[in-house]
Amino acid sequence: MTLTGKVKWFNSEKGFGFIEVEGGNDVFVHFSAITGDGFKSLDEGQEVSFEVEDGNRGPQAKNVVKL
């Protein structure tokens, strides 16, 4: 299932952050889950679509697409 949300914060030096989902819990996002070529980073407040999978520490985003 594909969800949409906004980037709550993303630390490009460490390569991870969180996506805010309206009416739901924040979802962890790692730079390796961002689709596209080049430097993979997200900006605070940026809208994205993504899928959720169970990671080692709970739900995490995969197939993240910048909208």
UniProtKB/Swiss-Prot annotation:
One of its GO terms (molecular function) is DNA binding. InterPro entries: Cold_shock_CspA, Cold_shock_domain, CSD, CSD_CS, CSP_DNA-bd, NA-bd_OB-fold. The keyword Transcription applies. Its main location: cytoplasm. PROSITE patterns: CSD_1 (PS00352), CSD_2 (PS51857). It is found in: Cytoplasm. One of its GO terms (cellular component) is cytoplasm. The keyword Transcription applies. Residues 5-64 form the CSD domain. Pfam families: CSD. SUPFAM superfamilies: Nucleic acid-binding proteins. SMART domains: CSP (SM00357). Gene3D superfamilies: 6.20.370.130, Nucleic acid-binding proteins. Keywords: Activator, Cytoplasm, DNA-binding, Transcription, Transcription regulation. Can bind to ATTGG and CCAAT motifs (Y-box motifs) of single-stranded oligonucleotides. Homodimer. This is Cold shock-like protein CspE. It comes from Bacillus anthracis. The gene is cspE.
